[in-house]
């Protein structure tokens, strides 16, 4: 299949992703709540819209996930101040009698989002951050406008603001202001060692995972997988040959991808926090979750997704394994007779400047799917999703978006993982290991955080 130049130029690197090909729009239609949405799912959609407006894309996944996690912790703890159904995360609050749950949700979300977006000056242009904040303020005014004035509203707002203040204080020095790009990182030179990828003579900060305070993990290395395979192994050769055949851009490099495999590659190029929150909105609305149930599932999801990034970045820089684009171009030095060098091999999309093993996208998918399986007590769930990284006319922001349909959380996670082969980013070993790594992080979140007070609760 020939990939149009517009899509080939999509870059998964920070603001470049916001600008390239016009695939990310600030239109509120990008994250409209699903039918049956409540105040919690509505604010999840509002946060996604603020993310898009603020250009928090591509390389800023950890910051994006953290913002959602903090917002949903504040929402969760505020609601539990009205009716304690699960253990709080940042603060044990008690609401004044009659406090409005919807007002509490809105105030908690608004205060966290405005504060976090305002703190992102270290990597966001001022106009981007201001656009995100304006989006939040518009949504806040609209939400409060639907709640009758009076004591219930006033008390709900006060409760939400107290919950927001608690999580903001708890995470005020958590290391997330560490610069993402490290221009001084020394690339490797031996076969198998990570080297700068074409077009990016720098690396995403190799010490970032060391600087970040996890939400649910004991430390960044808690579930670090074992090392990647030997360059001389049969499995390595098989993985090189697979991605060499399927991951090319079909312009400089011929590709054997099918049309559907190309769609999968581009569909899952969306950021993991945007995609998995979008999926969770659809499922939670279809399942009719109430405010408290919604607060818990989104809280668990985003706490775990944030730590998924921390865990995978620690793993990547512990092993520093080279990317497929480097491995294929330098296959003549890997010592494996079953691989063949192609010095001009080019992946479908530009490779992010961070080591291969394990796949962060796969970790995020494994994490999210495990949280959702555990929360809903089943893997079997039918749902559909759109994407913001498909060609123009097919995205979530378009009138007739292309939808992909899934019958289980595992199916979505597996497709998410294999997409990184089709896009030319990761070896199969990295995506399979990443999915398993993520499942362990998801289990950790569900086993130890936001646990129901009543063990007979539906969720």
Region locations from a protein language model:
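Bacterial N-terminal signal peptides that target proteins for export
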Residues: 3-15
